[in-house]
Amino acid sequence: DYQLPKNRQVPGDVRRVKTDSAELKETYERYAMHTHGAVLRDDLAWNEYWLWDSDDVMAAVYYNEKNEPDGYVIYWIANDVFHIKDMIFNNEDARTGLWNFVSAHFSMIDQVEGDTYTDEPLAFLLEDASIKEVISPYFMGRIVDFEAFVEDYPFRPSVLDREWKFTLMDPVMECNQGSFLLTISRDGHGQARRIMEPCEDKISIQTMTTMLMGYKRPEYLAKIGRIQAAEWTIDMLEDAIEQQTPYISDYF
């Protein structure tokens, strides 16, 4: 219990709800709209989300001072362990309130276990940062159609138009193989089109996916040789791509 966050006062409160309650869906929908990589769940996706859970799974929702749901924790308790299936929050008050709820169980548990995403600074937020963390592969992503992907990708706005000529390497999808000109307008709209000229800059479709999905930054990928490009190009990509770690708690 020394590692659990100390109770901190928040303006809202946490209440247990049924796992099929509308508050859970409402909270998640708001969360997904500002969280990079989160699945937009329809009824089928929610059914899949609960498919393999036991009847012991419970849910608790944090309500703000306006009685609006701002976060939730899905959990179960077994063998003196508080298992967290999922915890989401739309602001810091909700995060604090949910951890207050978890900490309130300290007298009946020996430890807390759960899953979160890479780079979540969980240890930093605890009273004692000496915790065991294990990184496990969970999902694999792939850009199937690069030109179509770029059309819908939300680049950062800028005061200048930007462009990058490069060779994209994809041994599987012919539509992604070849030289491209990527243009990014001032309002952040991207467009990729094929060009018939050799390019010094090179990147594989795997690295492109890693970069655009936010798993690794352009500067790091260039440092380890996964992107061949001039320093000013890497700086442009750093500025154009949002710095958000992807999060997904669904499995299908």
PLM regions with names:
Residues 4-252:
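Intrinsically disordered, low-complexity, positively biased terminal segments
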